[in-house]
């Protein structure tokens, strides 16, 4: 593909120093920019990625998307939040109650408890990561993907967990 006017001659942004700290085993991943998205690829599979990238194949998804560069900001991705490679304390986190977790999954606005640092915060329910919000102090912007949100108005009164045997 030919590059558009804006993209022509533009160098890839430098990799943010803190991005390596997002991964629990940073030495086993190589970081690369794919357009404005920073992706982490397992070094164990680097030969395979090189082979795939050399062919005219359309790769839908590979590695872990750590986030997106928008201007001077680096916005962490939902993939990173759900990845087992995420360092547990890489971001400030807050534990949500059932009602707030459902609000988050519906992509509704959340009000976080005071004392939480401003910036990107990992929200959890029962210690499991759900995704990121950007804490602005008086409110938090929900970064949950629009296409993944819960769209039904029905919320069960009782939580039923189905565990396999």
Where are the regions a protein language model picked out?
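Polybasic, low-complexity RNA-engagement segments
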Residues: 1-165
């Amino acid at each position: 593909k030919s590059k558009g006017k804006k993209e022509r001659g533009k160098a890839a942004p430098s990799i943010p120093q803190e991005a390596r700290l997002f991964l629990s085993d940073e030495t086993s991943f190589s970081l690369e920019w794919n357009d404005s998205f920073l992706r982490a690829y397992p070094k164990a599979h680097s030969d395979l990625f090189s082979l795939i990238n050399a062919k005219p194949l359309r790769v839908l998804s590979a590695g872990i998307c750590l986030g997106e560069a928008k201007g001077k900001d680096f916005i962490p991705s939902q993939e990173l939040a759900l990845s087992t490679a995420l360092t547990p304390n890489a971001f400030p986190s807050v534990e949500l109650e059932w009602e707030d977790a459902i609000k988050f999954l519906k992509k509704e606005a959340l009000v976080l408890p005071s004392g939480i640092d401003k910036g990107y915060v990992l929200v959890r329910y029962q210690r499991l990561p759900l995704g990121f919000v950007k804490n602005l102090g008086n409110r938090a912007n929900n970064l949950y993907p629009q296409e993944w949100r819960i769209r039904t108005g029905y919320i069960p009164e009782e939580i039923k967990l189905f565990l396999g045997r």
